[in-house]
Amino acid sequence: MNRTIFKIFFAIFLLLATLIAYLTLWPTGLKPQAWYPQEAPKLEGKFSLNDILSNIEIFGSEMGEGPYEKIVYRYGTGPEDVAVDKNGNTYSGYHGGLIRKFDKNGKFIKIIANTGGRPLGLALDNIGNLVVADANNGLLKIDDQGKIITLTTESEGLPLGFTDDLDIASDGKIYFSDASYKHTYPNSYEDVMEHSANGRLLVFDPNTEKTKTLLEDLYFANGVALSPQEDFVLVNETNEYRVTKYWIKGIKKGTSEIFIDNLPGFPDNISVGQNDIFWIALYGPRMEIADYLADKPFLRNILFRLPESTRPLPPNYSFVIGVNSEGKVIYNLQNPSPDSFSPITSVKESDDYLYFGSLLYDGFGRMKKSKLPTN
């Protein structure tokens, strides 16, 4: 009997020793960096709780429209961003590479193209070409015949790793982000866990067909938006809960500064709307465990070794803020319901609606602007 008990305890010991060795010593390839976030702002005052985004309806399908109803897999999944043309037609890119066009009533018109990658940020240029930040294939342009033209796949000799979002200036220059030159789209979680400054803000000049790096050492460079006067460009740094401003005109040209920081969530895409409002999509609210582990790279490496299903993720929570050109919060839009349309990855404003992208839904979201609070 004693011999049997000994064998059992020895087997348990070996199992635990193996598990501990795996969690602490197994190489991950990550080099997590310690960082020190500010205390997360409370959801009160300018970020007070509300359910305004409960007014979102699923859009971009001929069937199943309605609050939070996940649509049958017909057009694809994951419309991360939405572009809206002057006629109210909408364009969105999906997992698998398809880009689809819908009319203003949400009726499917046609497939624009298939990039064969992962189209993320979208914008229409001044002659109607659709410019696409494709995470896998770089910066692309799609003409009215559906022809795909690769604009750039590198900047100053360094290949694009994760092309994310873009905005187009009136002179045709395209400002765009490379979220991480080190970690690609399928491995974005690694960039979050590592918290290394692998992101870049870039500009492509169609006249010279050259790409220039404007800012580097960004912490997951995500959404990009030009100011209405085109004197500066904003880029979201998801992993730092902040938005950075880069001046492209004036006496500060070529310099950067923090536009707004210590946000209550993870900033994803950003766009400029009417009345000079910058709409910032927050992928989800801040997580206590993420901030707790910020200065503990050893523990983050252990967490990374755990099964993917055990990794902490933001809860289902719709969150969007609108700020003015000084970074002051003007709109605070939320829906904390577990059934909310979330995570929201982008916001685009038209005359009558706000449109919302998401990585998980089969359609994108839409809400009447009449539902916005009066400020």
Language-model segments: residues:
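Sequence-structural signature of mature extracellular/luminal beta-sheet repeat domains
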Residues: 2-375
